[in-house]
Amino acid sequence: MALPAGLRGAGMFGRAVHRVPLTVGDVLSHMDDTARRLKTVSAHLTYTTVTVLVNDRATQVGALFFRKGRRPEVLVRFSKPDTKVILFKKNRAEVYYPRINQIQEYDLERRRDLLQQFLLLGFGTGSGALEGTYHVRYLGEKPLHGTMTPVLELTPIPKDVAAQLSKVDLWISPQSWLPVQQEFFEASGDYLIASYSQMRINEPLGPSVFKIRAKHGVERVKMN
């Protein structure tokens, strides 16, 4: 059913900001409510990777498009510092590098959980799935861009996930109950911060959004 224009966007999930302390159960309950109604998300994104040993900080800026379904579809389009497009679709990933006109293809058949455990963590993830993969702890509300924001600390349970991540901090919008920031920490101390803004929720995203528009003569390379 099409939504009236006035109900589209992050505000459709808006609730009055709590005046009493939230619990982990409160946050997960709100996230479950959002997950049941979530269909699409588009947002401006900033990825910042930090390599602690050499004190290196690299930032990529772009846009995220997500359509929920039995097989979620995700397209990430980076515009700075270099143009790059990443498409996740039907247990496959494609990475397009316009400068060299090449698409690198990855088979994710054996890693179907990759999107939900990393890139889409918190986007439509129900509490059952979250607590099945992570020990969940509520860190309280912390300031982020001038807004007191609930923060969940996730510690991986499966050994294969724990081998890559020591923990994840999810900063959850108290209006949309979707992540506005994900912080992924590696055992080495290195970390990635994914920040989302200008979020638009449940607006129509057609099939054409989830396609890579490559230049003529693009080279395709299978990576696994």
Identify the residue ranges that each predicted region occupies.
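Bacterial Sec-dependent signal peptides at the C-terminal "C-region" and cleavage site
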Residues: M1-V17
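Hydrophobic, well-structured mid-protein blocks that either form specific transmembrane helices
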Residues: V85-G124
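Beta-turn initiation residues at beta-strand->coil junctions
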Residues: F78-S79, Y97-R99, E183-E186
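Gly/Pro-enriched, hydrophobic low-complexity segments
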Residues: L22, Q104-Y106, L114, F118-L119, ...
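N-terminal mature ectodomain segment of secretory-pathway/periplasmic proteins
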Residues: L22-V95
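Mature, folded catalytic cores of secreted/periplasmic enzymes
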Residues: G6-G11, D33, W177, F185, ...
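Short, surface-exposed charged micro-motifs
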Residues: A63-F65, K84-V85, H135, K167-W171
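Beta-strand-connecting loop/turn residues
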Residues: P72, N91, N101, Q175-W177
